[in-house]
Regions:
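Conserved PLP-enzyme active-site core in the AAT-like
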Residues: 4-24, 31, 41-54, 62, ...
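Solvent-exposed, charged/polar functional surfaces in cytosolic regulatory/catalytic domains
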Residues: 74
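Interfaces and regulatory segments of ATP-dependent nucleotide/adenylate/phosphodiester-chemistry enzymes
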Residues: 1
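Short glycine-rich or small-residue beta-strand-to-loop segments that form or flank ligand, phosphate
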Residues: 54, 58-59, 85-89, 323-328
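Short beta-strand to alpha-helix junction loop
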Residues: 63-67
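Conserved C-terminal alpha-helix-loop-beta "cap" of PLP-dependent enzymes
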Residues: 306-422
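Acidic, PIN/NYN-like endoribonuclease modules and their adjacent C-terminal/linker elements
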Residues: 34-38
Length: 423
C-alpha cells in the first residue's frame, strides 16, 4: 500500500495493506472483465456512428433528436437488446421500473415475482403496501404472486414453473436490495428465465438490472430476459450522468414503455434531451472502468472488515454480480459510526454527519452516507442501511479505487475513534 496522508491508525493501515494484497487475484479478474466490457461499449459507439452532433441537445418537443436516438441504439447494442429507451426524465431506477411494469401489464394480467419480495420502494407501486386507490398495479386490476427464495438463498425453480403458467411477467430482481440473500448471477437469471418460459412460452421475463451492469461479461438479455431496467446514477451512468434511467430489450416491449413514459402514439419520437446527451454518452463510455473501481472498492472493503472480525456478504473471495457489499456490523452504534466514517471520506459534504431518517418508500428509518457529486449516485462511494437487525451496511460505489479504499479506511477509523473496534 502506498503512503496514506490521512490520520489512520498504524494498526489499521497494516491490516488494510494485508487485505489489499490478498485481493490481487480478484482485482485481476475485475480488470479483465472491464477491458472486455469497455471494448463492447466502444464497438457500440463506433457501429452506431456517434458524432459530435450527438453530444448536443434539443428543446421543446425534441423531434428528430439525433443524440437521443443514437444513445438508444448504443445502449441497445452494448446491453444486448433490440431497442432501448434511455431518458433523463426517469427520475430514478424505481421510476423506470414502474414505467416498465405499467407499460407492459394490463388489467387481469399477473405479475410473478420470482425472487421473493422486491425492493421496499416497489411495494407501493405493486400495491402490497400503502393505501388502496393510490394508483398501484393492483388498483388497476393487475394480480400479484410471489415465489420466495429457498432458505432465502436460491430460486425455487419448481414453484416458479408452477406459478409461471398464466402469468404475464416473470419479474427478477438481480440485486439483493435490503436483504442478505445473494445477488443473482447472469447464469442464475438465465435458469429462472428458462424455467419460466418452459412452463409458459409467452411469459415476459423482466429483470431489475440495477447495480449489475458491466459487472459480468454478459447481461441478462443474452440469457433469456426480454426486458431489463436500470438507473443512470448507478453503473451505466459512469459517475457522469446526472440523472436518468433506461429500459432495454425487445423492441415491442420498449415501445410500450415509451408510450407509458410519454403518451400513446408518440412514444420515443418526443422528449427533448436538453443538455444531457454528452453526460449520458460520456458516462456510458466510462462505465465499465467505473464499475471496475467500485468492484475493487467492494472487494477490498469486505476483506478489510473480515480481518476486523465482521461477516460480509458476499465474502471477499466470492465472484461478484453487482457492486453492492453488505457488512454485518452487529448493532446500531457500529452501523451509524461506519456510515458517518464513509461520509467523512467523501469528496462532497465530508463535514456533514448523517443521521437516520424516515426516507420515503421505506418502512423503517434509513441512514445514508453519500458525499457524492450527484445526489444519490450509487456508483459513487456510498453506504446506506435501514436501522433494523442485522444492522448491515450496504456499501456500493467508488469511481476511483484509491479514493474508495481511503473512504473505507476512514470508516474503520471512525469506529476505532469511538472505541468500537478492537485491533
Amino acid at each position: 500500500m502506498n503512503e496514506c496522508i490521512f490520520n489512520i491508525d498504524p494498526k489499521l493501515l497494516s491490516l488494510a495493506s494485508e487485505a489489499e494484497n490478498e485481493c490481487r487475484e480478484m482485482f485481476e479478474k475485475i480488470d479483465s472483465n472491464a477491458e472486455y466490457n469497455g471494448q463492447k461499449v466502444l464497438k457500440a459507439f463506433i457501429d452506431n456512428r456517434v458524432s459530435e452532433g450527438c453530444l448536443k441537445g434539443t428543446t421543446g418537443y425534441g423531434y428528430g433528436d439525433m443524440g437521443r436516438d443514437t444513445i438508444d441504439k448504443v445502449f441497445a447494442q452494448a446491453l444486448g437488446g433490440e431497442d432501448a429507451l434511455v431518458r433523463h426524465t426517469f427520475v430514478n431506477g424505481t421510476h423506470a421500473l414502474s414505467t416498465a411494469l405499467f407499460g407492459v401489464l394490463r388489467s387481469g394480467d399477473t405479475m410473478l415475482a420470482c425472487t421473493g419480495k422486491p425492493y421496499d420502494t416497489l411495494e407501493e407501486i405493486i400495491g402490497i403496501r400503502g393505501e388502496k386507490g393510490s394508483g398501484s398495479l393492483i388498483d388497476f386490476g393487475v394480480k400479484y404472486e410471489q415465489v420466495d427464495l429457498v432458505d432465502e438463498l436460491c430460486p425455487d425453480y419448481d414453484e416458479i414453473a408452477k406459478k409461471a403458467v398464466g402469468a404475464k411477467i416473470a419479474y427478477i430482481q438481480r440485486s439483493r436490495g435490503y436483504s442478505l440473500r445473494p445477488s443473482l448471477t447472469v447464469e442464475i437469471i438465465g435458469k429462472i428465465a428458462e424455467t419460466a418460459k418452459k412452463a409458459n412460452p409467452d411469459i415476459i421475463v423482466m429483470v431489475d438490472n440495477c447495480y449489475g451492469e458491466f459487472v459480468e461479461r454478459k447481461e441478462p438479455l443474452s440469457v433469456g430476459a426480454d426486458i431489463i431496467i436500470g438507473s443512470l446514477i448507478k453503473n451505466p451512468g459512469g459517475g457522469i450522468a446526472s440523472t436518468g434511467g433506461y429500459i432495454c430489450g425487445r423492441a415491442d416491449l420498449v415501445e410500450k414503455c415509451a408510450d407509458r413514459l410519454t403518451c400513446v402514439g408518440m412514444g420515443k419520437e418526443v422528449g427533448c434531451s436538453l443538455n444531457q446527451n454528452r453526460e449520458m454518452l460520456l458516462g456510458f463510455f466510462l462505465a465499465p472502468q467505473m464499475v471496475a473501481s467500485a468492484l475493487k472498492t467492494s472487494v477490498f472493503a469486505c476483506r478489510f472488515f473480515e480481518k476486523l472480525g465482521y461477516k460480509t456478504l458476499p465474502e471477499s473471495g466470492e465472484t461478484r454480480t453487482d457492486i453492492i457489499a453488505s457488512i454485518l456490523l452487529e448493532n446500531e452504534e457500529n452501523l451509524v459510526a461506519f456510515c458517518q466514517g464513509i461520509q467523512k471520506g467523501s469528496p462532497v459534504d465530508s463535514y456533514v454527519t448523517p443521521e437516520a431518517w424516515d426516507m420515503p418508500g421505506y418502512d423503517s428509518k434509513v441512514i445514508m452516507a453519500a458525499g457524492a457529486f450527484t445526489m444519490g449516485a450509487s456508483i459513487e462511494l456510498s453506504a446506506d442501511a435501514p436501522i433494523r437487525p442485522p444492522f448491515a451496511a450496504w456499501l456500493q460505489g467508488g469511481i476511483t479505487y484509491p479514493t474508495g479504499k481511503a473512504g473505507v479506511m476512514l470508516a474503520a477509523q471512525e469506529m476505532y475513534n469511538k472505541g468500537l473496534l478492537r485491533i
